Curated annotation (Swiss-Prot):
Domain PINc: 70-190
SMART domains (alphabetical): PINc
Record-given protein name: Transcriptional protein swt1
Organism (species): Schizosaccharomyces pombe (strain 972 / ATCC 24843)
Gene name as annotated: swt1
Alphabetical list of SUPFAM superfamilies matching this protein: PIN domain-like
Length: 465
């Protein structure tokens, strides 16, 4: 199909200025439109053959998860003006550099949706052209293209080019994945440079290979990595947390471990698989930091996992539970410290609940339900709060099934992966850079290392056997 391509500076400036003008009018500020990365590709009627149909099934073979080495973040003006170059870049990454990914910011998806309805304008035609191409890509499950999800941001209030910049900052600072902005907007490129985000604009002769070579030269030496040789190991390796709650009364002179409530049943079985107790405010107790001892979730031993009913799932579920139990206590203390500004007051609020610090996944669900708006307001829709306890209960049932063969497990691998993603997102939002302060870089590295393991393992064959 013939495409309109814009490669002269006057045309590029026209597209960029047109989009900036519409952004200034706030025309496409509506939020929560469906992300292309979350739409079921089978629901589309392809308007024309996929541009990847002849690419020897490059996109049809699902790759095992591996954290990207880098991202290219597309601005709307770059996508509209240079669609063929964007297609070449995606094809190049799919074939040669599978650990580099092109990301469509949420705002770009919104702007495409708004622009494509403008039948009489040049930008409208370019938007429809780009929209059809993207639908074909997602229909083909192209692994080197994804959309920014609604929760993947540092600030929920940014709009227009600031939202695109926020997308770059989120991936580079919160996910520790280097991001390169592809944009013809000089002002946005300057903003990106201020935040140490690399940017590239179109120039005559620019090709996909040169974009990658300039941005990520090491990708060429690592693109031969064979991700298919990852094997299922029944080890108990879990990356250890590198951050603890700072005692602000002593200005960082010591650290405070979030302790176990002595009134809980201390047996491993009781704490690991406890159900939600009826919540009774009369049972709330006033406790202070001096009354606590550290609580550490007791993970299953290697021998226990090997003798479990479903060892692969058992290992994964237990490791995720250990992280969520231990890290939720620490992170909630940081959120409330930020809210109240006083360590003792924050701890008093947390410890009013008998389920704090949590000892099992249901305690985690209970505490996050209580403090939902403190932690997630503006990041997750409020209706997610009502599902939190049921998700924790179901996870708890899966743990019993995996270890003892009691009850039912996940319906299929897709359901397991959905829940792994859920807890990964909860942890990511709990441990935002602004909450962690000086410990952010170290802690985020620890978090991303673990999440990468979870997602990769949940996608392995025979995980539920």
């Amino acid at each position: 199909m013939d495409r309109m391509e814009i490669d002269d500076q006057a045309g590029i400036d026209f597209v960029t200025e047109s989009i900036n003008s519409e952004r200034a009018r706030n025309r496409w500020s509506t939020s929560h439109i469906p992300s292309l990365s979350e739409i079921n590709p089978s629901s589309f009627q392809s308007p024309s053959p996929s541009p990847f149909a002849s690419s020897t099934s490059l996109a049809s073979k699902p790759a095992r998860y591996s954290k990207p080495l880098g991202l290219f973040v597309l601005d709307t003006n770059f996508l509209l003006s240079h669609l063929s170059l964007c297609q070449n870049l995606i094809e190049f990454l799919t074939a040669r550099c599978p650990r580099l990914v092109v990301v469509l910011p949420w705002t770009v998806l919104q702007e495409l949706d708004g622009l494509k309805s403008e039948s009489s304008s040049t930008c409208g035609y370019l938007a429809r052209q780009a929209h059809n191409f993207l639908l074909q890509c997602f229909r083909s499950n192209v692994s080197s293209l994804r959309g920014q999800k609604v929760h993947e941001h540092c600030s929920s209030t940014e709009k227009g080019d600031d939202a695109i910049l926020d997308c770059c900052i989120y991936y580079q600072e919160e996910k520790l994945i280097p991001a390169v902005l592809l944009s013809d907007d000089k002002n946005l490129s300057i903003k990106a440079a201020v935040h140490h985000i690399q940017s590239l604009s179109f120039s005559k002769g620019l090709e996909a290979a040169s974009i990658v070579q300039t941005s990520f030269p090491s990708a060429f030496s690592s693109n031969s990595e064979n991700l298919e040789n990852l094997s299922m190991d029944i080890d108990l390796t879990v990356s250890q947390p590198l951050a603890t709650a700072t005692n602000h009364r002593n200005q960082g002179a010591s650290t405070v471990d979030i302790p176990m409530d002595r009134t809980h049943d201390n047996s491993i079985w009781a704490s690991r698989y406890a159900h939600f107790p009826p919540y009774d405010k009369k049972k709330d107790t006033t406790r202070s930091a001096a009354d606590y001892i550290p609580y550490t979730y007791t993970a299953l031993t290697k021998e226990e996992i090997l003798h479990a009913s479903h060892p692969r799932a058992c290992k994964l579920l237990d490791q995720i539970t250990k992280i969520m139990v231990e890290e939720t206590a620490f992170l909630l203390s940081r959120h409330l410290l930020k809210l109240w500004g006083d360590y003792d007051l924050a701890m008093t609020k947390l410890l009013a609940s008998p389920q704090f610090p949590p000892q099992n996944i249901n305690d985690v669900g209970h505490e996050l339900y209580i403090h939902w708006y403190t932690c997630f307001d503006g990041y997750l829709p409020a209706q997610e709060r009502s599902n939190l306890k049921s998700k924790a209960e179901l996870w708890n049932e899966w743990m019993l099934w995996a270890e003892r063969g009691i009850g039912i497990g996940p319906k299929n691998q897709e359901e397991l992966q959905t829940y792994v993603t859920f807890w990964s997102n909860i942890w990511t939002l709990l441990s935002r850079r602004e909450i962690l302060g000086d410990q952010a870089s170290t802690y985020i590295g620890f978090r991303e290392q673990n999440i990468e393991k979870w997602v990769e393992r949940s996608g392995r064959e025979r995980i539920l056997s």
